[in-house]
Structure formats: C-alpha cells, structure tokens
Amino acid sequence: TIINVKCTSPKQCLKPCKDLYGPHAGEKCMNGKCKCYKV
C-alpha cells in the first residue's frame, strides 16, 4: 500500500507503516512516498 507520507529513506516509513499494519509491517521508500506491506 502506498501511503501519503513523504520519505527519503525507508526508516521514515517505519512508524506510519507500523501504525497501519502493526509490528510486523514492512516498509519501502518508492518515488518519495512510503510503501507499506504486511510481512
């Protein structure tokens, strides 16, 4: 899921992705936006 959070590194997506999917969330930074996925 691409969420509307700007990023330059995946670490910036860690908290919003965990808020979305819980402790087992995965995160990537793609095209300046966070992408979250369930692991």
From Swiss-Prot:
Domain of life per record: Eukaryota
Alphabetically ordered keywords of this record: Disulfide bond, Ion channel impairing toxin, Neurotoxin, Potassium channel impairing toxin, Secreted, Toxin, Voltage-gated potassium channel impairing toxin
Chief site of localization: secreted
One Pfam family this sequence matches: Toxin_2
Localization annotation: Secreted
GO terms assigned for molecular function: ion channel inhibitor activity; potassium channel regulator activity; toxin activity
Gene3D superfamilies: Knottin, scorpion toxin-like (3.30.30.10)
Residue(s) at site: Basic residue of the functional dyad: K28
Site keyed Aromatic residue of the functional dyad: positions: Y37
GO CC aspect terms: extracellular region
SUPFAM superfamilies linked to this entry: Scorpion toxin-like
Keyword Lyase among UniProt keywords: no
Expression (tissue specificity): Expressed by the venom gland.
InterPro entries, per database record: Scorpion_toxin-like_sf, Scorpion_toxinS_K_inh
Disulfide bonds: C7-C29, C13-C34, C17-C36
UniProt free text on domains: Has the structural arrangement of an alpha-helix connected to a beta-sheet by disulfide bonds (CSalpha/beta).
Stated role: Inhibits human voltage-gated potassium (Kv) channels Kv1.1/KCNA1, Kv1.2/KCNA2 and Kv1.3/KCNA3.
Family: Belongs to the short scorpion toxin superfamily. Potassium channel inhibitor family. Alpha-KTx 02 subfamily.
Protein name: Potassium channel toxin alpha-KTx 2.22
Organism the protein comes from: Centruroides bonito
